[in-house]
Structure formats: structure tokens, C-alpha cells
């Protein structure tokens, strides 16, 4: 594919977009700045593949940043959406589909006894922070360096995702007063969390984290870390919140909390539960969720929340994921892929460390292990940029950032994985 690789139409559309939208994109990481390139403009997606405007086909490991766990445009999801479209695109009123998806989430996720649907992961995290404060009567929050909880002001402190990709310390426009109650600790460091509790007695509403960090690359929790946080929050009368926007229904049907056997008080979700349509949700113990309006005094609302199309896509996606062998297959695909990537890099003499859990994986171009964001920043981002371009030319679409997780889907075949590993072998040899 390298000799015929042509992105003229993508380039033309992106050039025009820069006069119409800030940076030419609707979300910063899509601009390819951290890989020193120009973005590929997609025309259509199907299964594990994406096609750009120039007709290039890519094996896709971004999966719309996580939602496409069953593959893009799954025929059963599309059929369900076509039927739902006939009934309308938005009601602005209760619909029965909300009940069905809510019931499926409550049945699956250990921490969730009640759930509220919103339109994005950012919305879910904003609302859950307000709820934490309302329930505990405390203002302070502990988050972890490199964890990303959306672009709300109070979370843009040592954040991951696009903030990490662009190397931004924080964001202009966020008042110091807004983030003064946001405390940070290194991921996988229980002692740092203990110190924050000791320094702020009876002041911390809760601890929020990605149970697997996917917005600073891929950093799994060390044994005992999540369990330790659960114990610390209980001891201090604080809440534990898992941001499972990325890991929910991807790591296992019940999310990371089911996989690791640690149950938080509250959980935020998104991505997979919308089946590719905009959605978010937050849920938890009934005692806490009963504070949300109109049942309780904590206000949160949304015009398009519980949108019937998003509910439809989410229901069908979760039905597909409940089928036997789903997560075993995702685990097998990710294991073969990450093992092949690491072996290929080592053959080329390139330092690498990589890991995976279920349908989620990541690697860093440095010596491992990587246990936190500071260690993640040791990755060779410049070399990753060269790798990204080389892989594009071979028909492989990776996240355009050294600080984002990758995703396998049920649509990826063993042949797709082998093709990808061969592309890595060739690309590592080219860039060394």
C-alpha cells in the first residue's frame, strides 16, 4: 500500500476545515499534531475497517475511541437504528428504551443500583462530582495524574488524553478558584493518597480515577491499588468513583470493577453503552443517586439525555456483548497483537513495554514497566510519530498520540492481527 498511499483529498478537506473550525477539528487529538502529520479524513467505516476520502482502507484500532467494540456499523445495530428512526430522532420526554438500557446497566455493573443518562462522558463526570459534593457535604476531590475525566474545569489538572497529547499543563480560562479543591496524586501510589487524606481531614468528598488509565496510554492498576483506595475512602467517609467511560463493558461485561473485584460507590460510563452514538451515564448506590433531581435536591438536566437512538444502539450493543465467548475473544486478539508488537520492536532494537486487558491495549517506546503518568512520559514520542506515519502507509490506523490506548473489536480477525504485526515489523525496521 505504501507506493500507492495518497491522501490528497483528506489534505484538501483538512485545509478547508482550518478556516471553519479551531485547528480544523472537533476534538484536539484528531489534528495529528503530536505525530507531526495531517489527519486522515474518513469517508465510511465497516467492521474493523475504515476508508478515507482517497479510498485507502485501514485496519482500525481506534474504534471511534472505544465505542466500536462490536466493530463499526454492526448490521444488527444498524437495523435497530433504522427501525427506531421511523419513530423519531428525539423525544424530549421519557421513553421505554431508557428503562430497558438502565435495567441492563444495573444488572451488569456491580456498583450501579440507579442510573442517570446524559450525553457524554464529560457530562457524566461533571454531574458525578457535583453529586459527590452534595452527598458528603465536602468540596475537595482527589484525582490522579494522567487520568482524564473530560474537559470540565475542575478536572483539567494534570489531565490525560488530549491535554497530555498536546503537552498542556492546564488550560487557560480555568480559574484557580475552580481547581483549588482538586488534589492530585501519582497513579498506583497509595501512600500519596494517604498523605492527602491526612493533610485534608474531613474535607475530601471522594477519589475519582480510571481503574485502568487509558488516556495516558495504557496503565493497569498494580495489585492492591484499587483495593487500597476502597479501604481508604471508607475509612475517611469519602466516596470512590470509577470513571469507566472507557473500560465499561469493554474490560468485562461488568466493567473494570467486575474484572478486579472492587466495587466503587459511583461509576461514570459512556462510549460502549451508546453503541457509537453520543451518550454518557452515571450511577451508583440508590442512597446516593436518590439525591439527583427530581428525586432529590442536586440538579442536573439535559435536552437530549436518554435520546431514543442512543438508547437503541446501546441496547443492541449490550445484547451482542452478552453472547458467550465475547471477552475471551477480545483478550485473545489483544494478547496476540501486543505480543507481536513487542517482539517486532525488540527485533529492531527499539525499547518497548506493552500490556493489555481484554479489548484494550497499549505500548510505550521506552523501558518498562510504566506505572504512572511520569513514567509514561519517558516514551519516545518523536519515534512514535514516525511509527504512526509508517503504519498509516501500510493500512493500519493507530491513535494519533503516544498517550492513548488502543482497542480491539469483535470484528477483527486473526488475519487482521497478523497483517498488523507484519506492518509493525516492517515499520520498526524502517524507523530505527
UniProtKB/Swiss-Prot annotation:
Assembly behavior: Homodimer.
Known catalytic reactions: (S)-4-amino-5-oxopentanoate = 5-aminolevulinate
Organism: Prochlorococcus marinus (strain MIT 9211)
Compartments, as annotated in UniProt: Cytoplasm
Cofactor dependence: pyridoxal 5'-phosphate
Enzyme superclass (EC): isomerase
N6-(pyridoxal phosphate)lysine PTM sites in chain numbering: 271
GO terms for cellular component: cytoplasm
PANTHER family recorded: GLUTAMATE-1-SEMIALDEHYDE 2,1-AMINOMUTASE, GLUTAMATE-1-SEMIALDEHYDE 2,1-AMINOMUTASE 1, CHLOROPLASTIC-RELATED
Protein name: Glutamate-1-semialdehyde 2,1-aminomutase
Record Pfam families: Aminotran_3 (PF00202)
Any one GO molecular function term: pyridoxal phosphate binding
InterPro entries (alphabetical): 4pyrrol_synth_GluAld_NH2Trfase, Aminotrans_3, Aminotrans_3_PPA_site, PyrdxlP-dep_Trfase, PyrdxlP-dep_Trfase_major, PyrdxlP-dep_Trfase_small
Keyword Isomerase carried by entry: yes
EC numbers, comma separated: 5.4.3.8
GO terms under biological process: chlorophyll biosynthetic process; protoporphyrinogen IX biosynthetic process
Gene name of this polypeptide: hemL
Record key words, sorted: Chlorophyll biosynthesis, Cytoplasm, Isomerase, Porphyrin biosynthesis, Pyridoxal phosphate
Family in the record: Belongs to the class-III pyridoxal-phosphate-dependent aminotransferase family. HemL subfamily.
Pathway: Porphyrin-containing compound metabolism; protoporphyrin-IX biosynthesis; 5-aminolevulinate from L-glutamyl-tRNA(Glu): step 2/2; Porphyrin-containing compound metabolism; chlorophyll biosynthesis
Domain of life, source organism: Bacteria
Amino acid at each position: 500500500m505504501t507506493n500507492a498511499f495518497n491522501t490528497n483529498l483528506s489534505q484538501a478537506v483538512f485545509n478547508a476545515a482550518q478556516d471553519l473550525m479551531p485547528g480544523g477539528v472537533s476534538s484536539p487529538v484528531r489534528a495529528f499534531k503530536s505525530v507531526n502529520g495531517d489527519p486522515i479524513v474518513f469517508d465510511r467505516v465497516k467492521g474493523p475497517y475504515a476508508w478515507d476520502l482517497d479510498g485507502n482502507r485501514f485496519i482500525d484500532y481506534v474504534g471511534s475511541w472505544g465505542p466500536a467494540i462490536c466493530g463499526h456499523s454492526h448490521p444488527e445495530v444498524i437495523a435497530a437504528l433504522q427501525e427506531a428512526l421511523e419513530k423519531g430522532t428525539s423525544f424530549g420526554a421519557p421513553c421505554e428504551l431508557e428503562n430497558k438500557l438502565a435495567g441492563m446497566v444495573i444488572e451488569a455493573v456491580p456498583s450501579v443500583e440507579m442510573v442517570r443518562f446524559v450525553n457524554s462522558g464529560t457530562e457524566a463526570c461533571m454531574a458525578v462530582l457535583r453529586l459527590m459534593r452534595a452527598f458528603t457535604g465536602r468540596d475537595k476531590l482527589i484525582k490522579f495524574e494522567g487520568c482524564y475525566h473530560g474537559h470540565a474545569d475542575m478536572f483539567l489538572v494534570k489531565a490525560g488524553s488530549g491535554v497530555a497529547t498536546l503537552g498542556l499543563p492546564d488550560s487557560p480560562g480555568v480559574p484557580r478558584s475552580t481547581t483549588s479543591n482538586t488534589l492530585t496524586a501519582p497513579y498506583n501510589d497509595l501512600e500519596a493518597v494517604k498523605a492527602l487524606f491526612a493533610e485534608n481531614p474531613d474535607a475530601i468528598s471522594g477519589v475519582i480515577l480510571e481503574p485502568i488509565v487509558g488516556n495516558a496510554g495504557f496503565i493497569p492498576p498494580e495489585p492492591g491499588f484499587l483495593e487500597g483506595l476502597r479501604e481508604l475512602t471508607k475509612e475517611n467517609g469519602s466516596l470512590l468513583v470509577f470513571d469507566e467511560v472507557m473500560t465499561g463493558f469493554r474490560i468485562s461485561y461488568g466493567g473494570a470493577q467486575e474484572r478486579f473485584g472492587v466495587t466503587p460507590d459511583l461509576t461514570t460510563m459512556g462510549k460502549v453503552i451508546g453503541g457509537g452514538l453520543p451518550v454518557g451515564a452515571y450511577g451508583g448506590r440508590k442512597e446516593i443517586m436518590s439525591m439527583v433531581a427530581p428525586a432529590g435536591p442536586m440538579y442536573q438536566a439535559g435536552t437530549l439525555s436518554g435520546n431514543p437512538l442512543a438508547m437503541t444502539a446501546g441496547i443492541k450493543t449490550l445484547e451482542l456483548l452478552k453472547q458467550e465467548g465475547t471477552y475471551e475473544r477480545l483478550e485473545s486478539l489483544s494478547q496476540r497483537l501486543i505480543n507481536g508488537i513487542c517482539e517486532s520492536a525488540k527485533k529492531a532494537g527499539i525499547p518497548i513495554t506493552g500490556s493489555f486487558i481484554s479489548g484494550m491495549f497499549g505500548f510505550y517506546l521506552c523501558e518498562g514497566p510504566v506505572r504512572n503518568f511520569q513514567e509514561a512520559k519517558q516514551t519516545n514520542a518523536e519515534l512514535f510519530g514516525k511509527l504512526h506515519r509508517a503504519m498509516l502507509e501500510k493500512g493500519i490506523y493507530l491513535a494519533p498520540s503516544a498517550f492513548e490506548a488502543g482497542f480491539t473489536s469483535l470484528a477483527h480477525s486473526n488475519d487482521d492481527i497478523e497483517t498488523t504485526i507484519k506492518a509493525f515489523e516492517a515499520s520498526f525496521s524502517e524507523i530505527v
